[in-house]
Amino acid sequence: MDITQQKGLTTELHCILDFTNLGYSCLTPIDDSSKYDIVVDLGSKFIRVQCKTASWTDDTKEKAFAIHTNRQTTNTQKTTRHKYTEDEIDYFDTWFNEQGYLVSIREASGVIFTWRYEYPSSNQKQGIHIANNYKVEEVVKGIV
């Protein structure tokens, strides 16, 4: 297993543990053909979740972190990026800095989704996603 696969698996396991600690069951596909990593049984409904490894953003180190909201396939000739659709997944989940974060695919429609711990010094609010609003335990309350 290469380091990228190891990081992805670690993120996925943290996401599963996060939902499990909240009292929800998680289901995983038996093969790699599914676009989602886990299905979470929220009791009243199931959600398809794609787990993504987050990292600090280069220009705002320790103030913002982000995930790539696409997937890529690689063969001997090229790497191709693919966008997820609402027919494939419902949410993106990540585990970052000891906390799980969940965002719907509708909201994370770009190539990168960025969370910030606070508003920028310019006090810009439009298009800014404050991390506390996306904690898994808070988002799930709005789903069930």
Locations of regions flagged by a protein language model:
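Mixed-charge (Asp/Glu-Lys/Arg
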Residues: M1-S34, V40-V144
